[in-house]
Design a protein with these regions (language model features):
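Short, flexible helix-loop junctions that flank or precede catalytic/ligand sites
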Residues: 1-178
């Protein structure tokens, strides 16, 4: 367990791999038996974990997770590509129905070299986004992200350019991350 949550205004039940459970899948199944409102999966690393997380989201649970990807498009593709080709259409349908949003971040050195700053990509589950995922057109997701700025969406490149224009990162960093 990386961080021990304390019980303030809610109950937090944590499971540690190896000590409390043998796999993310077992931990998720156990969590679902306790009727949680929110489930935080440290990382969706395998097919079993993703399947159970999707099922949990379909039954009304808010599921939050991490994935080591850069950008919303890569995140969607990584989730879908974990499954064999014959299951991918079903997964796209499930994912399009339950995905509320993706926040992708990249940490980079500041222009001063003192500290780091995050550039973000934010994609929300709008009808256009959901349709593209369902239809297997994830390569087209950047267009509705770009046009969805008024909803709070932003592409990684736009975020990087904003950091550059405010002199938070230098040109070399901008080019290496865009």
């Amino acid at each position: 367990i990386e961080y021990m949550h304390t019980h303030n205004k809610c109950l937090v039940n944590q499971r540690e791999l190896g000590a409390d459970t043998q796999s993310f899948g077992n931990a998720l199944r156990g969590a679902l038996r306790q009727d949680p409102d929110v489930i935080l999966v440290g990382e969706m690393r395998d097919k079993e974990t993703i399947e159970i997380a999707l099922r949990a989201a379909e039954t009304g649970h808010l599921v939050l997770s991490t994935l080591h990807t850069v950008g919303a498009v890569n995140t969607m593709d990584r989730i879908i590509d974990v499954f064999p080709a014959e299951q991918q259409e079903q997964i796209r349908v499930q994912l399009s129905a339950v995905m509320e949003g993706v926040v992708s971040q990249q940490l980079m050195r500041t222009a001063t070299g003192k500290g780091r700053v995050a550039a973000f990509e934010i994609m929300l589950g709008t009808p256009a986004i959901r349709n593209l995922i369902r239809e297997g057109k994830t390569h087209q997701l950047l267009t509705p992200i770009q046009t969805g700025a008024q909803l709070g969406m932003i592409t990684m490149d736009t975020s990087l350019m904003g950091l550059y224009r405010r002199n938070v990162i230098d040109q070399r960093t901008l080019l290496s991350y865009s």
